């Protein structure tokens, strides 16, 4: 049994889908399928049920998954130690980041890091705030970057930048005329397009509404989307408002595709997460230092 076979098995088991697993680990579906079949044949076990185009773990597969994950974690710990011995000359740093940060704020930081340490392979996975925190807790990522607060006692949290949410509307929306708005107007006078629950953007907006004495469930939510771009496109096309990161909305505002409504929302923090009990690699420390010298407002200008 090889490390690659273990990694392939875990990827397929977690997704229960050959093609998605192959994409995640950058192999062809045929290579993934062959690896699983070879593993089953060599040990005389069946790890997956093939049900039409779907696959499901057998009871044997479910039991083996726990051991496979533990073994991979031990191997990665050994790899981390070796990369430490080599300093910052080579190695890998796995990052998870919430969408706003990953799409608009983090790429320039990653580019500067690559230029400084070209031998370190940076891997970035995008999720919402909750999935980013879960990845750091599980050891799938050494660092996570999220918007706003996160309630996870296993993690340390450091503010690396700040951002503001803006209420944006289409140019033909009534709020585009610059009229002063109250929190009550936000509830009564417009439909809304929102990010999904669990996203830092939505959590920050709902927390701000509570601070204004508004129950978030009273907002007239017309549509929910899993990405900032989808939210912005929907607002541009219809009679809805949205609360979105100023960084992500900046180009739309500059081009006149959207207008910022006259309602100020509190600033929020971009936070860097790491596990309190896991060793901090030199690469992660170097990246954290680079994060601390960037501000999203500079990126948006």
Describe the function of each predicted region:
Residues 175, 191-213, 281-285, 297-299:
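Secondary-structure junction motif
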Residues 259-301:
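A late-sequence structural motif
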Residues 90-153:
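Central regulatory/effector-binding core of bacterial HTH transcription factors
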Residues 40-57:
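A short LG(V/I)-centered, amphipathic sequence patch enriched
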Residues 39-40, 113:
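Conserved amphipathic alpha-helical core elements
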Residues 10-31:
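Short helix-boundary/capping micro-motifs
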Residues 157-193, 197:
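Flexible hinge/capping segments at coil-to-helix
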Residues 128-133, 137-141, 146-147, 206, ...:
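Hydrophobic hinge/microswitch elements
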